[in-house]
A protein has these predicted regions:
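A solvent-exposed interaction/effector surface
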Residues: 2-202
């Protein structure tokens, strides 16, 4: 998936969203599932119609264009990990790039580096891009390596949903897909995740 080339390999060099692991469990003897609390974070997102992989490619291109200088400050914004950058200042890229299906299409999101606020983050020139602060979320997460094919993601999404049903944990929305690596990373070293928002315990 060449659209992730700019992301680089997810490692300690890339900033990632902060979360707290509340619990973990092994499901069906092999799937490690975590329950996480995510803090609010500043993000840029775009909604794209089409099949999942094509929509991710187009959404990544639009958001990468923004962080690499197509913004009101003409500033590079450093990338973060996962996918859910005036002068030559940098907006670092984060990881992962995240993707979730909505009624309007696929929402592709980049988390913005923690150094920015809504006031200091350069504004996108492309009006398709929305800047927002995410709500605090509790998420169930299933991590896996290998290729991020449609079949693998849908399979892992079903496994995670089955676990939540078994545990009688109510969900709040559709699965979110998180991509941490570039396409040149060896498959067994890739980090992919399926995340499902869930109800917080009272």
């Amino acid at each position: 998936m060449a659209f992730l080339t700019a992301c680089g390999t997810a490692n300690s060099d890339l900033e990632m969203p902060k979360y707290t692991v509340l619990s973990n469990a092994v499901y069906d003897g092999q799937y490690n599932i975590e329950i996480r609390d995510y803090a609010p974070r500043l993000a840029a997102e775009v909604t794209v119609k089409g099949e999942r992989e094509a929509a991710l490619s187009e959404g990544f291109r639009i958001l990468a264009d923004y962080i690499f200088g197509n913004n009101t400050a003409k500033t590079d914004i450093a990338m973060t990990a996962p996918v859910t950058q005036s002068s030559n200042a940098k907006i670092a890229m984060t990881a992962p790039v995240t993707q979730v299906e909505s009624a309007q299409g696929w929402v592709v999101q980049f988390t913005m580096p923690a150094q920015y606020t809504t006031e200091t983050l350069p504004k996108p020139n492309n009006q398709q891009i929305q800047i927002l602060i995410t709500k605090p979320l509790r998420m169930a997460a299933l991590r896996f390596s290998g290729f991020s094919s449609e079949t693998r993601f849908q399979n892992r999404a079903k496994i995670l949903a089955d676990y939540l049903t078994q545990q009688k944990i109510a969900t709040l929305g559709p699965p979110e897909f998180a991509y941490y690596n570039d396409p040149f990373t060896f498959p067994w070293r890739k980090r992919n995740e399926v995340l499902i928002p869930i109800v917080s315990s009272p």
